[in-house]
From Swiss-Prot:
One of its GO terms (biological process) is organic acid phosphorylation. It comes from the Bacteria. Keywords: Kinase, Transferase. Coiled coil: none annotated. One of its GO terms (molecular function) is glycerate 2-kinase activity. Belongs to the glycerate kinase type-1 family. This is Uncharacterized protein slr1840. The keyword Ubl conjugation does not apply. SUPFAM superfamilies: Glycerate kinase I (SSF110738). It holds the Pfam family Gly_kinase. InterPro entries: Glyc_kinase_flavodox-like_fold, Glycerate_kinase, Glycerate_kinase_RE-like, Glycerate_kinase_sf.
Amino acid sequence: MRQILIAPDSFKGTLSAGEVCQIALDVLAPEFDCVAHPLADGGEGTLEAIANNLDGQWQTVRVQGPLPDQTVDACYLWLPQEETAVIEMARASGLPLVPVGEHNPEIATSYGTGELITHAARRGAKQIQLAIGGSATNDAGLGLLMALGWQFLDSQGQSVGWGGQALGKVAEIIPPVLNAFPQVTVLCDVTNPFYGANGAAQVYAPQKGADPAMVQRLDQGLRHFARVVREFDGFEINFPRAGAAGGMGGGVAWALETKIESGFTAIAKLTQLEQAMAGCDLVITGEGCFDHQSPQGKVVGGVLELAKKINKPAIIVAGQCQLSQTVLPNVLKIFSLVGPDMPLEKALQHPQTALKKRLVQVKQYLIQSQN
């Protein structure tokens, strides 16, 4: 009997990676021996994907929310065997936590994310994996760093406060004494620099509620903060990926000497994807829309690259497909949920039904290819 590794991303907005795996197991058994390995790229579904693969414990902490007068119950994943905490910034400082009409990156803070890191450090974490997708903030991680004991003072010696508005006021930096602090790895798949035309404010602040005038103020604040950091210790903060999560990538890389990794790469490593793949005969992967971006750092592209490396054939099952399998080495076949028998609207309304229908065809294809 052929063993199949089911290693999908979520089908965004419809099915989690775990749900995709469960449906695949239900359809393909008992003819095939399937192993579920749900994945993520550091964005939506990261904690669930890791929890499905490793023996983790959910920790819930009441922390500062993205708005100054807001508290939230945010959870992170504790992996005792690895002495590692996996934290999603969006759980404490995410855009979905901000009520409609109140989005404002000039006041939104990442302080709550810092409180989660503090909780994990006190628990004994040696490693912290920090996924920074989905943020409401443009504060360069100042809030997070304040929660860890950093002080950012204005020209009068007063705290600059929270949010993106604080960046332009920073005149003095006072670091804390952090003894035996965990190694922090940032999971990030965007390549934007700290400031400028492709920087944090210009590209992402409009999605967080900033009008054009606010975007300019935020960008100027990031430029000012970069100068202050350069004068403080010579660190050049305007590098690729520094603009992720409103400048969080740059802020924590500077202050905490973090590593910044591709979200998929870090999660694949943590969940030992290559070892799981090596023990299987075939890999089935998939996502909501398989397009020209998929091979570039996304989950499906990463899975295909790994499968090619260790010479494993693959099948793609996607909500929609905009790439031909002829340009993809080692891909046997691509199955799209949307087709003549399954219009897009119906597939979105009934994703479980659409996925089951295609997986039945996958099963028939595999049985025929064995004969």
